[in-house]
């Protein structure tokens, strides 16, 4: 109870009010909508979303149209930012910003990302990548939509949120490395203030990679679980926030802060996705995942393997956690 009070002291009436104010916003995220978005990303027109290929480019265009629909601010003239892949090929990170409160410092940022690329077509076979990582991509889009809608009700957050759909994770994480170089080189500029976004202004990076499956459960065997890695990189006062949100908003998922209880696998898996470059540069970084499964990087990682009911719950939990962290 002491931790809860330190983080944000709410009495029962205030908690009830807080839960209610999110309900209209959460109704925007339906299982049907999640399925439709995953189907789009896994459609044959996107050809497995390989970085630098036509299918990857079409996927980038679709994500840009979603960012436009949500009203996210562009960095420069476009949401798309090139990623050099070699051999004359280019990928594209899609980057947009949701502004923070006018009443607080405008130069504080949290980066929220998910990679949208996958393996493409290999030896004539398409790899749809439904869990890896259409699931994380639709989580990114729906969290951006909910936070944007919440802002439109008059509720601002202290931090600016930079949403990034990374390309080229499957190409040695070239997309996230490119974003970091933009930050290092002063290329990432606040679209409102014109100030350069530097390392010292980034409070946290949050990555979502493989959130859609339930076939690799934790010890209890429950389907409704989520794995959060990097929690110990946060300030101690914030480390219980996911559990607080899980309880406060009656989401009631099983939470693990390790990769299936193994210290070695936790350390290894924590470095296998786009948060790695931020970890290496001292930025507190979080990975949300449901874990690698026997479908990962297989042709049968397809939309019908996604549990949209559980994916929706995971999205809600991450959304509420972000709302409290912002």
Please state what every model-predicted region is.
Residues 1-17:
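Bacterial Sec-dependent N-terminal signal peptides
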Residues 41, 67, 84-123:
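Acidic/His- and Gly-rich active-site-bordering loop/insert found
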Residues 65, 289-326:
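His/Asp/Glu-rich mid-to-C-terminal helical/loop segments that flank catalytic regions of hydrolases
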Residues 96, 112, 117-173, 318:
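Alpha-helical metal-binding/catalytic segments enriched in His/Glu/Asp
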Residues 12-58, 63-65, 69-73:
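N-terminal hydrophobic or amphipathic helices/low-complexity stretches enriched
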Residues 166-273, 285:
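Metal-dependent peptidase/peptidase-like ectodomains
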Residues 20-28, 44-54, 81-85, 124-133, ...:
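Second-shell loop/turn segments in exported
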Residues 48-99, 256:
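A non-catalytic alpha/beta surface segment that caps or lines the substrate-entry region
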